[in-house]
Amino acid sequence: MRLFLSLPVLVVVLSMVLEGPAPAQGAPDVSSALDKLKEFGNTLEDKAREVINRIKQSEFPAKTRDWFSETFRKVKEKLKINS
């Protein structure tokens, strides 16, 4: 009786072992993950370039540069007068 039960169990176990590992059903493919990462990097690069161009074209850098130049000139004049 034991032999009759052991043989089918052994056949099922051997078939499972010889079948190999089951493919992961929910695991994403590595190449698709890399493609998504590349797309994200390109999007981020485009947005960063757009922001930098917007900053370059705005008046803020020019005003800041002028303010620093004017302040530096005033400090320089005060140091010349005191010296």
From Swiss-Prot:
Q: Which GO terms describe its molecular function?
A: fatty acid binding; phospholipase inhibitor activity
Please tell me where this protein is predominantly located. secreted
Show which residues constitute the signal peptide: 1-26
Q: Which Pfam families match?
A: ApoC-I
Q: Name one GO biological process term.
A: lipid transport
Q: Keywords, A to Z?
A: Lipid transport, Secreted, Signal, Transport
- Where does the record say this protein resides? Secreted
Q: Which family does it belong to?
A: Belongs to the apolipoprotein C1 family.
Q: What is this protein called?
A: Apolipoprotein C-I, basic form
What would be the name of the gene that encodes this protein? APOC1B
